[in-house]
UniProtKB/Swiss-Prot annotation:
This is Uncharacterized protein YnaE. It comes from the Bacteria. It comes from Escherichia coli (strain K12). Induction: By cold shock. One of its GO terms (biological process) is response to cold. To E.coli YdfK.
Length: 77
């Protein structure tokens, strides 16, 4: 296993990361946009500067890295 593959977060944070991703899915769907990795990344990265999101900056970075890893592994360009 490479050092970049090691997790820098605790398994106890997994529910919060899932909540962040779930909220992003709901908001993207409300906007009528297709739900895919790119639109979820756009939504999360666009809202990362909001004050309500700043409390969870580490969790947001984890969610973003999960989405980016997913896009790198499964993305078709």
């Amino acid at each position: 296993m490479k050092s970049k593959d090691t997790l820098k977060w605790f398994p106890a944070q997994l529910p919060e990361v899932r909540i962040i991703l779930g909220d992003a899915v709901v908001e993207v769907a409300k906007q009528g946009r297709p739900i895919n990795t790119r639109t979820l990344l756009d939504y999360i990265e666009g809202n990362i500067k909001k004050t309500s999101w700043l409390d969870n900056k580490e969790l947001l970075q984890t969610a973003i890295s999960v989405l980016k890893d997913n896009q790198n592994l499964n993305g078709k360009m």
